[in-house]
Amino acid sequence: MNKKLGHKDHFHFIGIGGIGMSAIAMALIKKGYSVSGSDLIQNKETKSLKTLGAIIFDSQIKKNIDFVISKFQDHTLNCVISSAIKDENEELCFCKKNNLSIKHRSEILAMIMNSYTSLSIAGSHGKTSTSTFLSTLLELCTHDSSSITGGIIPIYDSNAHIENTKYLVTEIDESDGTIKNYNSDIGIINNIDFDHCDHYSNIDEVLSSFKKFASNCQKLLINYDCKFTKNNFTSKNQWSIKESNNIAYSLIPNIINKDKTVGKYYEHGKFIDIINIPVPGLHNLSNITAAIAACRMVGVSFKEIKKNTESLKLPKKRFEFRGEINQRIIYDDYAHHPNEIKATIDLARLFIKDKNSSDREEKGRLIAIFQPHRFTRVKQFIHEFVKELSKADVIYVTNIFGAGEKNIDNIDSQLIANLIYKNNKNVTCLKDNYEINEKFFKLTKKNDFIINMGAGDCHNLWSILKNKNTLNN
């Protein structure tokens, strides 16, 4: 692992059920470390950790730390936190009072990365998808790859896969500025956008954070199609889905539909071959091109890559088909930034277009259900949210998921709905998933294509619906 850690170290995660925290915890267990953690919400990840031997508490009180200290008396206790953990957290306060070691999750992930040839995916959008595509290709092409990501990778059915391998694919979080803590052999920057207004004041601060990450990478792979990466970073390793001249890796689409994208693949301007991508959407094509480029940078043959692209799948909650209720098609997506909503609605339109062109029944509508995430993000991007959401045929906006933020400016979802109404009269504010469930058949009709978007707890809707309806999936 790292000289700073030994197997006499014990790790206690406050908020262990989070998708990123649980992945790091799983990695430590696989590496032989003892792990415990607490979370107020028990989920699939906490159950998996229990199965692997972790001690999981469903409360966050100082007695938990006392128990861990007594059970692992001959170990050095490391309390692991994310930026989401508040200063007043009882476990964290107890650790501080007793001068126990407190480490940010980024420090632990960085230490794990030191044992591998690391390929790290950073960027404002598409990190989890790109991490999934790269993990899948490296696994199938080399059988010598591990992964720690912020999403469930289909090939592993997990957010962490740790073995004694050469390569490690990691997803790097920029939201809190800890991106500077990582040293990577190959750093991949998908794109850069202004987001995370709770931490950054403007795009320049975001760029500064990414530049610190880039300076710590041995090699850098950047998206030529993003103006912020193109204009602010220098690297001979670039990818594009728009241009091939003087670009190291390009995949130019010529067939785009709801089932696949077919494109011409180039390296350094030279045509190599046609590639069939079984994942729709131009944003996904860009993410896959990044994964292909990274594989080529570590020496994977193009022949192996092409053969295994047919196995590529999106991670969970990324345009994920959930099922069908009485001829209403339902998808989930993690989109919570205006640009992500744009990409998701554009992709959904491909499905609507295909279905309506072949269906003699009443044409379906594109219904967008959106749970805004963070008051600061809504305040910063409200007009951009309105612009993109208005493009759906029908829009339902639920209460804002605060993610621990205080609503200082008294912002609510009705404000978003009122502005959307000026562009699209088919907009309604709803309280939550339970109200959607109660009114589901009044809110929808046969042949509707429903896309449920957000980064909060909105994806619990389908488990609520299944308790009342027959969900065919």
UniProtKB/Swiss-Prot annotation:
Keywords assigned by UniProt, alphabetized: ATP-binding, Cell cycle, Cell division, Cell shape, Cell wall biogenesis/degradation, Cytoplasm, Ligase, Nucleotide-binding, Peptidoglycan synthesis
Localisation per UniProt entry: Cytoplasm
Annotated EC: 6.3.2.8
Taxonomic path: Bacteria, Bacillati, Cyanobacteriota, Cyanophyceae, Synechococcales
PANTHER family linked to this entry: UDP-N-ACETYLMURAMATE--L-ALANINE LIGASE (PTHR43445:SF3), UDP-N-ACETYLMURAMATE--L-ALANINE LIGASE-RELATED (PTHR43445)
One GO biological process term: peptidoglycan biosynthetic process
Statement: the UniProt record of this protein carries the keyword Cytoplasm: yes
Name used for this protein in its record: UDP-N-acetylmuramate--L-alanine ligase
Gene field: murC
